Amino acid sequence: MIETIFDLNGEKTMIENNKEELMRNICEKFIKKISKNIDDFDFFYEEKIIDFKLKLEEILNLSDKNTNKILITVKYKNNSNTNEEEFDSITLIYKKIKDEPKIKIFGKKFVKNNEKICNIIFKGDTYSLQEDFNMVDNYNIGDEIIIKLSGINSITNIDEMFFRTEFFSSPDIYKWNTKNITSMSNVFYGLSILSKLPDISNWDMSNVTNISGFFYECSSLKSLPDISKWNTQNIIDLSDIFWRCSSLEILPDISKWNLDSTKYMRNIFYECSSLKSLPNISKWSINNATNICNMFYGCLSLEKIPDISKWDISNVIDLSYLFWGCISLHEIPDISQWNISNVKSLRGMFCNCISITSVPDISNWNTYNVNNFSNMFYNCYSLITLPDISKWNTWNAMNMGFMFYNCSSLTFIADISNWSTGNIRFKKFMFKGCVNLLKQRIPNKFNDDL
Protein backbone atom coordinates (compact mmCIF):
# COMPACT_ATOMS: atom_id res chain seq x y z
CA MET A 1 0.00 0.00 0.00
CA ILE A 2 1.12 3.59 -0.64
CA GLU A 3 1.15 5.81 2.42
CA THR A 4 1.26 9.49 1.50
CA ILE A 5 0.45 12.69 3.42
CA PHE A 6 -0.83 15.72 1.50
CA ASP A 7 -0.65 19.17 3.05
CA LEU A 8 -2.98 21.64 1.37
CA ASN A 9 -3.28 25.02 3.11
CA GLY A 10 -2.61 23.46 6.49
CA GLU A 11 -5.12 20.65 6.02
CA LYS A 12 -3.39 17.28 6.12
CA THR A 13 -4.86 14.23 4.41
CA MET A 14 -3.44 10.71 4.45
CA ILE A 15 -4.12 8.37 1.56
CA GLU A 16 -3.25 4.69 1.57
CA ASN A 17 -3.78 2.97 -1.75
CA ASN A 18 -2.15 1.67 -4.91
CA LYS A 19 -0.34 4.07 -7.20
CA GLU A 20 -3.20 4.58 -9.68
CA GLU A 21 -5.74 5.10 -6.93
CA LEU A 22 -3.38 7.51 -5.21
CA MET A 23 -3.38 9.83 -8.21
CA ARG A 24 -7.12 9.49 -8.62
CA ASN A 25 -7.58 10.52 -5.01
CA ILE A 26 -5.40 13.56 -5.57
CA CYS A 27 -7.72 14.67 -8.33
CA GLU A 28 -10.94 13.74 -6.58
CA LYS A 29 -9.97 15.67 -3.45
CA PHE A 30 -8.21 18.66 -4.96
CA ILE A 31 -9.15 18.87 -8.65
CA LYS A 32 -12.87 18.20 -8.59
CA LYS A 33 -13.52 19.94 -11.88
CA ILE A 34 -11.79 17.22 -13.87
CA SER A 35 -12.02 14.17 -11.64
CA LYS A 36 -14.68 12.53 -13.78
CA ASN A 37 -12.49 12.71 -16.87
CA ILE A 38 -9.47 10.84 -15.55
CA ASP A 39 -8.54 7.83 -17.66
CA ASP A 40 -5.03 6.83 -16.77
CA PHE A 41 -1.57 7.95 -15.74
CA ASP A 42 1.68 7.75 -17.69
CA PHE A 43 5.24 8.84 -16.97
CA PHE A 44 7.24 10.84 -19.50
CA TYR A 45 11.00 11.39 -19.38
CA GLU A 46 13.48 13.70 -21.07
CA GLU A 47 17.17 13.70 -21.94
CA LYS A 48 19.22 11.02 -20.19
CA ILE A 49 16.43 9.76 -18.01
CA ILE A 50 16.87 6.07 -17.38
CA ASP A 51 15.25 4.27 -14.44
CA PHE A 52 14.33 6.12 -11.25
CA LYS A 53 14.41 4.99 -7.68
CA LEU A 54 12.55 7.64 -5.74
CA LYS A 55 10.56 8.23 -2.59
CA LEU A 56 7.46 10.38 -2.62
CA GLU A 57 7.96 12.71 0.37
CA GLU A 58 5.44 15.52 0.25
CA ILE A 59 3.24 17.68 -1.89
CA LEU A 60 4.63 21.21 -1.76
CA ASN A 61 2.25 23.13 -3.91
CA LEU A 62 -1.07 22.76 -5.68
CA SER A 63 -2.66 25.09 -8.19
CA ASP A 64 -5.99 24.59 -9.95
CA LYS A 65 -6.32 27.97 -11.60
CA ASN A 66 -6.24 26.40 -15.04
CA THR A 67 -8.02 23.12 -15.70
CA ASN A 68 -5.72 22.46 -18.65
CA LYS A 69 -2.62 22.48 -16.50
CA ILE A 70 -2.68 21.57 -12.85
CA LEU A 71 0.67 21.62 -11.08
CA ILE A 72 1.48 19.35 -8.19
CA THR A 73 5.08 19.85 -7.19
CA VAL A 74 6.52 16.80 -5.48
CA LYS A 75 9.82 16.62 -3.63
CA TYR A 76 11.91 13.52 -4.25
CA LYS A 77 15.13 12.10 -2.90
CA ASN A 78 17.36 9.54 -4.52
CA ASN A 79 17.60 6.30 -2.55
CA SER A 80 19.85 4.52 -5.02
CA ASN A 81 22.97 5.44 -3.06
CA THR A 82 24.00 6.85 0.30
CA ASN A 83 24.24 10.41 -0.97
CA GLU A 84 20.71 11.79 -0.97
CA GLU A 85 19.94 14.04 -3.88
CA GLU A 86 16.92 16.16 -4.71
CA PHE A 87 15.18 15.60 -8.00
CA ASP A 88 13.43 18.06 -10.25
CA SER A 89 9.73 18.54 -9.66
CA ILE A 90 7.10 16.34 -11.21
CA THR A 91 4.24 18.15 -12.86
CA LEU A 92 0.74 16.74 -13.18
CA ILE A 93 -0.74 17.72 -16.52
CA TYR A 94 -4.36 17.52 -17.61
CA LYS A 95 -5.07 17.89 -21.28
CA LYS A 96 -7.87 16.80 -23.61
CA ILE A 97 -6.36 14.81 -26.45
CA LYS A 98 -8.70 13.86 -29.27
CA ASP A 99 -11.64 13.81 -26.86
CA GLU A 100 -9.79 11.33 -24.67
CA PRO A 101 -9.11 13.25 -21.45
CA LYS A 102 -5.98 12.03 -19.70
CA ILE A 103 -3.99 12.77 -16.63
CA LYS A 104 -0.27 12.68 -17.39
CA ILE A 105 2.71 12.89 -15.09
CA PHE A 106 5.92 14.37 -16.46
CA GLY A 107 9.18 13.76 -14.63
CA LYS A 108 12.59 15.18 -15.40
CA LYS A 109 15.98 14.29 -13.96
CA PHE A 110 19.42 14.57 -15.52
CA VAL A 111 21.49 11.66 -14.30
CA LYS A 112 25.24 11.57 -13.86
CA ASN A 113 27.56 9.42 -15.93
CA ASN A 114 27.48 5.77 -14.93
CA GLU A 115 24.59 6.41 -12.56
CA LYS A 116 21.91 3.74 -12.78
CA ILE A 117 18.66 4.03 -10.88
CA CYS A 118 16.31 1.09 -10.94
CA ASN A 119 12.73 2.02 -10.18
CA ILE A 120 10.26 4.26 -8.41
CA ILE A 121 9.40 3.67 -4.78
CA PHE A 122 6.14 5.04 -3.44
CA LYS A 123 6.35 4.61 0.32
CA GLY A 124 5.51 1.02 1.14
CA ASP A 125 5.77 -0.33 -2.41
CA THR A 126 8.32 -0.66 -5.17
CA TYR A 127 7.33 -0.54 -8.83
CA SER A 128 9.49 -1.18 -11.85
CA LEU A 129 9.15 1.52 -14.48
CA GLN A 130 9.77 -0.97 -17.22
CA GLU A 131 6.89 -3.14 -16.03
CA ASP A 132 4.38 -0.62 -14.75
CA PHE A 133 4.90 2.52 -16.80
CA ASN A 134 5.26 3.30 -20.46
CA MET A 135 8.47 5.30 -20.09
CA VAL A 136 8.37 6.67 -23.57
CA ASP A 137 4.66 7.12 -24.19
CA ASN A 138 4.11 10.27 -26.22
CA TYR A 139 1.29 12.78 -26.70
CA ASN A 140 1.02 16.29 -28.05
CA ILE A 141 0.89 19.08 -25.49
CA GLY A 142 -0.17 22.03 -27.58
CA ASP A 143 2.29 22.05 -30.48
CA GLU A 144 5.08 20.37 -28.56
CA ILE A 145 6.05 16.75 -28.16
CA ILE A 146 7.21 16.17 -24.62
CA ILE A 147 9.91 13.67 -25.34
CA LYS A 148 13.63 13.76 -26.02
CA LEU A 149 15.33 10.46 -25.61
CA SER A 150 18.83 11.01 -27.03
CA GLY A 151 21.35 9.23 -24.89
CA ILE A 152 18.97 6.85 -23.16
CA ASN A 153 20.62 3.47 -23.00
CA SER A 154 18.70 1.38 -20.52
CA ILE A 155 15.12 1.53 -21.76
CA THR A 156 13.86 -1.88 -22.85
CA ASN A 157 10.41 -0.99 -24.20
CA ILE A 158 9.36 1.71 -26.67
CA ASP A 159 5.93 0.30 -27.57
CA GLU A 160 3.55 2.91 -29.05
CA MET A 161 6.18 5.60 -28.70
CA PHE A 162 4.69 7.97 -31.30
CA PHE A 163 1.16 6.51 -31.20
CA ARG A 164 -1.13 8.61 -33.45
CA THR A 165 1.08 11.68 -33.02
CA GLU A 166 -0.18 14.59 -35.10
CA PHE A 167 3.00 16.64 -34.78
CA PHE A 168 6.16 14.63 -35.32
CA SER A 169 9.66 16.10 -35.26
CA SER A 170 12.39 13.82 -33.97
CA PRO A 171 15.14 13.98 -36.59
CA ASP A 172 17.77 12.73 -34.17
CA ILE A 173 16.20 9.34 -33.50
CA TYR A 174 18.81 7.76 -35.75
CA LYS A 175 21.29 8.42 -32.90
CA TRP A 176 19.36 6.44 -30.34
CA ASN A 177 21.14 3.60 -28.63
CA THR A 178 18.62 0.79 -28.99
CA LYS A 179 20.85 -2.12 -28.03
CA ASN A 180 18.89 -2.91 -24.85
CA ILE A 181 15.41 -2.54 -26.31
CA THR A 182 13.41 -5.76 -26.54
CA SER A 183 10.01 -4.48 -27.63
CA MET A 184 9.17 -1.99 -30.40
CA SER A 185 5.54 -2.74 -31.22
CA ASN A 186 3.42 0.02 -32.80
CA VAL A 187 6.26 2.57 -32.60
CA PHE A 188 4.90 4.72 -35.45
CA TYR A 189 1.29 3.53 -35.11
CA GLY A 190 -1.20 5.71 -36.96
CA LEU A 191 1.15 8.47 -38.16
CA SER A 192 -1.12 8.89 -41.15
CA ILE A 193 0.14 12.37 -42.12
CA LEU A 194 3.81 11.41 -42.06
CA SER A 195 5.30 11.31 -45.58
CA LYS A 196 8.88 10.52 -44.59
CA LEU A 197 10.61 8.85 -41.66
CA PRO A 198 14.01 9.70 -40.21
CA ASP A 199 16.78 7.23 -41.04
CA ILE A 200 16.47 4.34 -38.59
CA SER A 201 18.47 1.92 -40.69
CA ASN A 202 21.28 1.69 -38.13
CA TRP A 203 19.14 0.92 -35.11
CA ASP A 204 20.51 -2.03 -33.17
CA MET A 205 17.70 -4.60 -33.27
CA SER A 206 19.72 -7.53 -31.97
CA ASN A 207 17.70 -7.90 -28.75
CA VAL A 208 14.29 -6.93 -30.09
CA THR A 209 11.64 -9.65 -29.98
CA ASN A 210 8.54 -7.67 -30.98
CA ILE A 211 8.16 -5.25 -33.89
CA SER A 212 4.47 -5.93 -34.54
CA GLY A 213 2.62 -2.95 -35.97
CA PHE A 214 5.86 -0.98 -36.27
CA PHE A 215 4.63 1.11 -39.26
CA TYR A 216 0.93 0.41 -38.58
CA GLU A 217 -1.32 2.66 -40.69
CA CYS A 218 1.44 5.02 -41.83
CA SER A 219 -0.81 5.58 -44.80
CA SER A 220 1.10 8.49 -46.39
CA LEU A 221 4.52 6.84 -46.53
CA LYS A 222 5.58 6.03 -50.09
CA SER A 223 8.90 4.52 -49.07
CA LEU A 224 10.73 3.43 -45.94
CA PRO A 225 14.26 3.83 -44.61
CA ASP A 226 16.61 1.02 -45.59
CA ILE A 227 15.78 -1.54 -42.92
CA SER A 228 17.27 -4.39 -44.92
CA LYS A 229 20.23 -4.81 -42.58
CA TRP A 230 18.27 -4.96 -39.36
CA ASN A 231 19.28 -7.89 -37.19
CA THR A 232 15.98 -9.75 -36.87
CA GLN A 233 17.29 -13.02 -35.50
CA ASN A 234 15.38 -12.68 -32.22
CA ILE A 235 12.12 -11.33 -33.61
CA ILE A 236 9.18 -13.40 -32.39
CA ASP A 237 6.32 -11.15 -33.47
CA LEU A 238 6.34 -9.55 -36.93
CA SER A 239 2.57 -9.21 -37.20
CA ASP A 240 1.00 -6.08 -38.71
CA ILE A 241 4.41 -4.50 -39.36
CA PHE A 242 3.30 -2.79 -42.62
CA TRP A 243 -0.45 -2.86 -41.83
CA ARG A 244 -2.37 -0.50 -44.11
CA CYS A 245 0.67 1.37 -45.45
CA SER A 246 -1.60 2.08 -48.37
CA SER A 247 0.68 4.56 -50.18
CA LEU A 248 3.79 2.42 -49.94
CA GLU A 249 5.04 1.82 -53.48
CA ILE A 250 8.26 -0.03 -52.74
CA LEU A 251 9.74 -1.94 -49.84
CA PRO A 252 13.39 -2.14 -48.82
CA ASP A 253 15.06 -5.44 -49.65
CA ILE A 254 14.02 -7.44 -46.60
CA SER A 255 14.70 -10.74 -48.34
CA LYS A 256 17.66 -11.55 -46.08
CA TRP A 257 15.88 -11.01 -42.79
CA ASN A 258 16.54 -13.89 -40.41
CA LEU A 259 13.14 -15.06 -39.21
CA ASP A 260 14.22 -18.29 -37.57
CA SER A 261 12.66 -17.20 -34.26
CA THR A 262 9.52 -15.64 -35.70
CA LYS A 263 6.19 -17.17 -34.66
CA TYR A 264 3.61 -14.53 -35.55
CA MET A 265 3.44 -13.27 -39.13
CA ARG A 266 -0.21 -12.39 -39.64
CA ASN A 267 -1.19 -9.26 -41.57
CA ILE A 268 2.40 -8.44 -42.59
CA PHE A 269 1.48 -6.71 -45.88
CA TYR A 270 -2.18 -6.13 -44.95
CA GLU A 271 -3.76 -3.59 -47.34
CA CYS A 272 -0.48 -2.36 -48.79
CA SER A 273 -2.68 -1.50 -51.71
CA SER A 274 -0.08 0.40 -53.77
CA LEU A 275 2.61 -2.29 -53.77
CA LYS A 276 3.05 -3.84 -57.20
CA SER A 277 5.85 -6.20 -56.21
CA LEU A 278 7.56 -7.61 -53.15
CA PRO A 279 11.18 -8.30 -52.26
CA ASN A 280 12.27 -11.89 -52.84
CA ILE A 281 10.91 -13.40 -49.64
CA SER A 282 11.28 -16.94 -50.96
CA LYS A 283 14.20 -17.70 -48.64
CA TRP A 284 12.50 -16.54 -45.47
CA SER A 285 12.73 -19.30 -42.88
CA ILE A 286 9.27 -19.47 -41.35
CA ASN A 287 9.41 -22.96 -39.91
CA ASN A 288 8.48 -21.63 -36.44
CA ALA A 289 5.57 -19.53 -37.67
CA THR A 290 2.14 -20.49 -36.36
CA ASN A 291 0.02 -17.82 -38.03
CA ILE A 292 0.40 -16.27 -41.48
CA CYS A 293 -3.25 -15.34 -42.05
CA ASN A 294 -3.99 -12.15 -44.03
CA MET A 295 -0.35 -11.88 -45.06
CA PHE A 296 -1.15 -10.46 -48.52
CA TYR A 297 -4.69 -9.31 -47.64
CA GLY A 298 -5.90 -6.39 -49.75
CA CYS A 299 -2.71 -6.00 -51.81
CA LEU A 300 -4.83 -4.68 -54.64
CA SER A 301 -1.95 -3.71 -56.95
CA LEU A 302 0.25 -6.74 -56.36
CA GLU A 303 0.91 -8.38 -59.73
CA LYS A 304 3.20 -11.17 -58.60
CA ILE A 305 4.19 -12.93 -55.40
CA PRO A 306 7.72 -14.37 -55.13
CA ASP A 307 8.24 -18.13 -55.13
CA ILE A 308 7.09 -19.24 -51.67
CA SER A 309 6.84 -22.91 -52.61
CA LYS A 310 9.61 -23.99 -50.23
CA TRP A 311 8.25 -22.27 -47.16
CA ASP A 312 7.97 -24.72 -44.28
CA ILE A 313 4.53 -24.02 -42.83
CA SER A 314 4.27 -27.27 -40.88
CA ASN A 315 3.56 -25.35 -37.65
CA VAL A 316 1.05 -22.93 -39.15
CA ILE A 317 -2.52 -23.27 -37.91
CA ASP A 318 -4.17 -20.36 -39.74
CA LEU A 319 -4.08 -19.62 -43.48
CA SER A 320 -7.31 -17.65 -43.59
CA TYR A 321 -7.59 -14.73 -46.03
CA LEU A 322 -3.98 -15.26 -47.12
CA PHE A 323 -4.50 -13.84 -50.63
CA TRP A 324 -7.79 -11.99 -49.99
CA GLY A 325 -8.48 -9.25 -52.52
CA CYS A 326 -5.30 -9.62 -54.58
CA ILE A 327 -7.30 -8.46 -57.57
CA SER A 328 -4.29 -7.79 -59.82
CA LEU A 329 -2.77 -11.20 -59.20
CA HIS A 330 -3.18 -13.48 -62.22
CA GLU A 331 -1.33 -16.45 -60.80
CA ILE A 332 -1.10 -17.95 -57.33
CA PRO A 333 2.47 -19.04 -56.51
CA ASP A 334 3.07 -22.78 -56.35
CA ILE A 335 1.93 -23.84 -52.89
CA SER A 336 1.13 -27.42 -53.85
CA GLN A 337 3.79 -28.96 -51.59
CA TRP A 338 2.91 -27.00 -48.48
CA ASN A 339 2.44 -29.16 -45.40
CA ILE A 340 -0.86 -27.92 -43.98
CA SER A 341 -1.37 -30.85 -41.60
CA ASN A 342 -1.78 -28.48 -38.61
CA VAL A 343 -3.90 -25.88 -40.36
CA LYS A 344 -7.35 -25.32 -38.87
CA SER A 345 -8.64 -22.54 -41.09
CA LEU A 346 -8.59 -22.03 -44.86
CA ARG A 347 -11.33 -19.44 -44.61
CA GLY A 348 -11.31 -16.93 -47.47
CA MET A 349 -7.85 -18.02 -48.57
CA PHE A 350 -8.38 -17.04 -52.23
CA CYS A 351 -11.42 -14.82 -51.61
CA ASN A 352 -11.86 -12.00 -54.17
CA CYS A 353 -8.87 -13.09 -56.27
CA ILE A 354 -10.92 -12.02 -59.24
CA SER A 355 -8.20 -12.38 -61.92
CA ILE A 356 -6.99 -15.94 -61.34
CA THR A 357 -8.20 -18.61 -63.75
CA SER A 358 -6.69 -21.56 -61.89
CA VAL A 359 -4.99 -22.49 -58.64
CA PRO A 360 -1.95 -24.72 -58.02
CA ASP A 361 -2.45 -28.46 -57.64
CA ILE A 362 -3.53 -28.57 -54.00
CA SER A 363 -5.19 -31.97 -54.40
CA ASN A 364 -2.81 -33.70 -51.98
CA TRP A 365 -3.18 -31.26 -49.13
CA ASN A 366 -3.76 -32.92 -45.77
CA THR A 367 -6.91 -31.13 -44.62
CA TYR A 368 -7.75 -33.43 -41.71
CA ASN A 369 -7.51 -30.68 -39.07
CA VAL A 370 -9.26 -27.99 -41.09
CA ASN A 371 -12.56 -26.96 -39.52
CA ASN A 372 -13.28 -23.86 -41.60
CA PHE A 373 -13.45 -23.90 -45.41
CA SER A 374 -15.91 -21.01 -45.67
CA ASN A 375 -15.44 -18.39 -48.42
CA MET A 376 -12.30 -20.19 -49.59
CA PHE A 377 -12.86 -19.39 -53.30
CA TYR A 378 -15.50 -16.69 -52.72
CA ASN A 379 -16.02 -14.42 -55.75
CA CYS A 380 -13.20 -15.95 -57.80
CA TYR A 381 -15.38 -15.29 -60.83
CA SER A 382 -12.59 -15.84 -63.38
CA LEU A 383 -11.71 -19.26 -61.99
CA ILE A 384 -12.33 -21.87 -64.70
CA THR A 385 -10.96 -25.09 -63.21
CA LEU A 386 -10.05 -26.54 -59.84
CA PRO A 387 -7.65 -29.37 -58.98
CA ASP A 388 -9.10 -32.72 -57.96
CA ILE A 389 -10.02 -31.98 -54.35
CA SER A 390 -12.21 -35.08 -54.02
CA LYS A 391 -9.75 -36.76 -51.63
CA TRP A 392 -9.65 -33.93 -49.14
CA ASN A 393 -10.42 -35.12 -45.62
CA THR A 394 -13.30 -33.03 -44.28
CA TRP A 395 -13.96 -35.07 -41.16
CA ASN A 396 -13.42 -32.08 -38.85
CA ALA A 397 -15.02 -29.49 -41.12
CA MET A 398 -17.66 -27.36 -39.40
CA ASN A 399 -18.13 -24.50 -41.87
CA MET A 400 -18.27 -24.67 -45.67
CA GLY A 401 -20.60 -21.74 -46.23
CA PHE A 402 -19.97 -19.68 -49.40
CA MET A 403 -16.98 -21.90 -50.23
CA PHE A 404 -17.34 -21.54 -54.04
CA TYR A 405 -19.75 -18.59 -53.97
CA ASN A 406 -19.97 -16.72 -57.29
CA CYS A 407 -17.33 -18.79 -59.07
CA SER A 408 -19.37 -18.01 -62.14
CA SER A 409 -16.77 -19.21 -64.69
CA LEU A 410 -16.20 -22.57 -63.01
CA THR A 411 -17.28 -25.35 -65.36
CA PHE A 412 -15.97 -28.44 -63.59
CA ILE A 413 -15.44 -29.73 -60.08
CA ALA A 414 -14.34 -33.24 -59.08
CA ASP A 415 -16.82 -35.58 -57.41
CA ILE A 416 -16.91 -34.53 -53.76
CA SER A 417 -19.73 -36.87 -52.76
CA ASN A 418 -17.38 -38.70 -50.37
CA TRP A 419 -16.65 -35.59 -48.36
CA SER A 420 -17.70 -36.06 -44.75
CA THR A 421 -20.42 -33.68 -43.58
CA GLY A 422 -21.06 -35.18 -40.14
CA ASN A 423 -19.68 -32.21 -38.22
CA ILE A 424 -20.68 -29.44 -40.59
CA ARG A 425 -22.89 -26.79 -38.98
CA PHE A 426 -23.07 -24.33 -41.86
CA LYS A 427 -22.87 -24.99 -45.61
CA LYS A 428 -25.36 -22.57 -47.11
CA PHE A 429 -24.67 -20.89 -50.45
CA MET A 430 -21.72 -23.19 -50.98
CA PHE A 431 -22.18 -23.14 -54.77
CA LYS A 432 -24.40 -20.05 -55.04
CA GLY A 433 -23.69 -18.16 -58.27
CA CYS A 434 -21.77 -21.02 -59.92
CA VAL A 435 -23.96 -20.58 -62.97
CA ASN A 436 -21.76 -22.59 -65.37
CA LEU A 437 -21.32 -25.56 -63.09
CA LEU A 438 -23.61 -28.38 -64.11
CA LYS A 439 -25.99 -29.05 -61.27
CA GLN A 440 -25.53 -32.80 -61.57
CA ARG A 441 -21.87 -32.36 -60.63
CA ILE A 442 -22.90 -31.15 -57.19
CA PRO A 443 -23.94 -33.85 -54.69
CA ASN A 444 -27.38 -33.34 -53.19
CA LYS A 445 -25.98 -32.86 -49.69
CA PHE A 446 -24.23 -29.70 -50.94
CA ASN A 447 -27.15 -28.48 -53.02
CA ASP A 448 -28.51 -26.04 -50.43
CA ASP A 449 -29.71 -22.70 -51.81
CA LEU A 450 -28.19 -23.00 -55.27
Regions found by a protein language model. Give the residues of each.
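Eukaryotic mixed-charge, acidic/polar low-complexity intrinsically disordered regions
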Residues: K48-T73
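Short loop-to-beta-strand transition segments
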Residues: E28-L54
